Regions:
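A helix-coil-helix interface module used to build multimeric assemblies
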Residues: 2-118
Length: 118
């Protein structure tokens, strides 16, 4: 049948199964750990900490030690990943068609206008 109403267009969204449907309240705390935004926040965290490590160990020629303020700025990127950040990352991902590359671009945007731009 091809003339059915597309269920994906119904608002509020329809649950895919009982976990995000009738048990949503029970499993809601898991969203911070098992959702796609949680995965992307962890990716941001890993990329930021890896960059801090590379700078601290001078592992890549041309890097320099970061100031305490720069480290704090970097660590704020995953810490401040909120609904607006989730939407921005999704927008970047639509453009790049690559979830991890979108993380890189997201970080780059956050560093625009700072001492770490470039």
């Amino acid at each position: 049948v091809t003339d059915w109403t597309p269920l994906a267009e119904i608002s509020p969204p329809i649950a895919l199964g009982p976990l995000d449907g009738r048990y949503r309240r029970t499993v809601a705390p898991l969203v911070d750990y098992l959702s796609e935004p949680a995965l992307n926040r962890q990716r941001l965290h890993v990329e930021v900490e890896w960059f801090i490590h590379l700078c601290a160990t001078n592992a890549v020629p041309g890097t320099r030690a970061l100031t305490a303020d720069e480290v704090a700025l970097l660590r704020a990127i995953p810490a401040d990943f909120d609904a607006d950040g989730i939407a921005e990352h999704a927008e970047i991902e639509r453009e790049t068609i690559h979830d991890v590359k979108a993380i890189e671009y997201f970080i780059k945007r956050r560093l625009t206008g700072t001492s770490l731009e470039g």
